[in-house]
């Protein structure tokens, strides 16, 4: 049998939603938007690294 601890009692509410699934699509569209924004961010960083984009007064010297 599992031993009850004070830390376990504190953390129990965080685990109360385990196994429950939101109906429908839930927050999937929000995740998709953030993934797209992250992709744009990575593309901008890559283009700066390749010097495809030159920003005035920003020197890239690596």
UniProtKB/Swiss-Prot annotation:
It is found in: Cellular thylakoid membrane. The keyword Membrane applies. One of its GO terms (cellular component) is photosystem II. One of its GO terms (biological process) is photosynthesis. The chain crosses the membrane at residues 29-49. Pfam families: PsbH. InterPro entries: PSII_PsbH, PSII_PsbH_sf. Keywords: Membrane, Photosynthesis, Photosystem II, Thylakoid, Transmembrane, Transmembrane helix. It is a single-pass membrane protein. One of its GO terms (molecular function) is phosphate ion binding. SUPFAM superfamilies: Photosystem II 10 kDa phosphoprotein PsbH. PSII is composed of 1 copy each of membrane proteins PsbA, PsbB, PsbC, PsbD, PsbE, PsbF, PsbH, PsbI, PsbJ, PsbK, PsbL, PsbM, PsbT, PsbX, PsbY, PsbZ, Psb30/Ycf12, peripheral proteins PsbO, CyanoQ (PsbQ), PsbU, PsbV and a large number of cofactors. It forms dimeric complexes. One of the components of the core complex of photosystem II (PSII), required for its stability and/or assembly. PSII is a light-driven water:plastoquinone oxidoreductase that uses light energy to abstract electrons from H(2)O, generating O(2) and a proton gradient subsequently used for ATP formation. It consists of a core antenna complex that captures photons, and an electron transfer chain that converts photonic excitation into a charge separation. Belongs to the PsbH family. This is Photosystem II reaction center protein H.
């Amino acid at each position: 049998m599992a031993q009850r601890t004070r830390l376990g009692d504190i953390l129990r509410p965080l685990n109360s939603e385990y196994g429950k699934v939101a109906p429908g699509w839930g927050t999937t569209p929000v995740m998709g938007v953030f993934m797209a924004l992250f992709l744009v961010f990575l593309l901008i960083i890559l283009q700066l690294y390749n010097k495809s984009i030159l920003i005035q007064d920003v020197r890239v010297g690596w």
